[in-house]
């Protein structure tokens, strides 16, 4: 794991569940706000306002501050055609019940997907399995991988287009309203009876080349009202 210094105190975004100010990262200061967990053979770099992940065996890049619901995460991302077009994935509201600090020494995560089995988190695998599936799961920290049929999308309109900049939006409220939206279309809309009210956001991929830009975190404009 590469832990990178959180240098910008004024960029603290969540206090008592609400954004003090909208936070955005144009990556002009590099990857100072991010923590990288990656298997050997890959790299994470920043250039021209873009966070670039070139991966071989598995990579998660975490936004360092903890998020507290209600929260909206927005970013733009694409999968490059110069690599394997698959796995534009993300965790949000992720936490490890064994430790209050996700990044405390001894967490054991190394970029391999199995090393994340202890997390409680919302997860979308967008264009997974060689770009044949897009799935939402709520992991419970036991290693189980539950999948509701309505959260398993296989139609072409839900899969990745190479080199296309997607606008991704993630929502989580304290009441359990959870959404994953892409290009202003809600793909998954969930009411969680046991909400994950705090945790971390991470971008994930494996054996692909992805780019991320225009990252932001804020509160919803108004309280979300269920599904």
Q: Where do the language-model regions lie?
A:
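Enrichment for repetitive, rod-forming helical segments
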Residues: 9-10, 184
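Bacterial N-terminal signal peptides that target proteins for export
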Residues: 1-8
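Hydrophobic h-region of N-terminal signal peptides that target proteins for export
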Residues: 10-19
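Extracellular glycan-recognition regions
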Residues: 18-227
């Amino acid at each position: 794991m590469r832990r990178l210094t959180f240098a910008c105190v004024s960029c603290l975004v969540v206090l008592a569940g609400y954004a003090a100010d909208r936070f955005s990262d144009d990556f002009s200061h590099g990857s100072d706000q991010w923590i990288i967990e990656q298997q050997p053979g890959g790299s994470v770099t920043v250039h021209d306002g873009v966070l670039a992940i070139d991966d071989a065996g598995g990579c998660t890049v975490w936004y360092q501050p903890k998020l507290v619901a209600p929260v909206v995460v927005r970013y733009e991302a694409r999968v490059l055609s110069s690599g394997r077009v698959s796995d534009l994935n993300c965790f949000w509201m992720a936490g490890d019940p064994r430790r209050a600090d996700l990044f405390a020494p001894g967490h054991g995560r190394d970029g391999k997907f199995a090393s994340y089995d202890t997390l409680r988190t919302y997860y979308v695998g967008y264009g997974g399995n060689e770009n044949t599936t897009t799935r939402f799961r709520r992991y419970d920290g036991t290693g189980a991988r539950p999948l509701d049929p309505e959260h398993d999308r296989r139609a072409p309109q839900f899969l990745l287009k190479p080199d296309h900049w997607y606008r991704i939006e993630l929502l989580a409220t304290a009441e359990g309203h959870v959404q994953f939206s892409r290009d202003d279309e809600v793909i998954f809309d969930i009411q969680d009876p046991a909400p994950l009210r705090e945790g971390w956001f991470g971008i994930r991929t494996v054996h692909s080349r992805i780019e991320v830009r225009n990252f932001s975190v804020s509160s919803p404009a108004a309280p979300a009202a269920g599904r």
